[in-house]
Amino acid sequence: MSSVRAEILPVDFPNTAAARITIDAPASVIFDLLASPAAHQRFDGSGSVRNAISGPDRLFLGATFGMAMKIKVPYRIKNTVVEFEENKKITWCHLMKWTWSYELQAVAPNKTIVTESFDASKISGFAKWWLNRTGAMDHNPKWMAKSLVALKAICEG
């Protein structure tokens, strides 16, 4: 599995990033992990997700969930699910209004293309400062690719 890589995708807008991978598993298996906040730390490629601290076991449209995080310093963040299409797409955002999305495209019964995207193109003020201060935009594409490789390992393992 160490030679497996996700594809970092070109993006058209500043403060956005995207990566894609093909996983040999049904979309439902992958989506179940994405919709479970308690599972997020298992496939986080950034090392910033510590654990889920509040929210439902399984996400749904409008659900809120809290995560313990660490980027330079420990903090907690509350996320809200803003898009949810079972086994196809899930998107959440938090106070700074950038979004994390996962889109799943089943290409065969046991083969799914997963695209992870980050969109901070519409943020301003403190949120822009935070992204610059943490270096997130420099690191996000690589971290997203690592997350997708970890997600693939879990789903195919």
What residue spans do the PLM features occupy?
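Hydrophobic ligand-binding cavity/cleft-lining segments
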Residues: M1-G55
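Intrinsic-disorder/low-complexity, polar/charged segments enriched in Ser/Thr/Lys/Arg/Asp/Glu/Gln
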Residues: T16-T22, T64, R76, K89, ...
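Short beta-edge strand/loop motif at the mouth of beta-sheet-based domains
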Residues: A18, A38-I77, F84-N87
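A short, structured loop/turn motif at beta-sheet edges
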Residues: D24-S28, D57, E83-N87, E103-I113
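Beta-strand elements of well-folded, non-transmembrane domains
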Residues: A25, I71-V73, A120-K122
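Hydrophobic pocket/interface hotspot
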Residues: V29-L34, H40, F65-M67, V81, ...
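Short, highly charged C-terminal tails/helix-capping segments
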Residues: R50, A150-G157
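Beta-strand/loop substructures that line and gate deep hydrophobic ligand-binding cavities in soluble
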Residues: C93-K146, L151
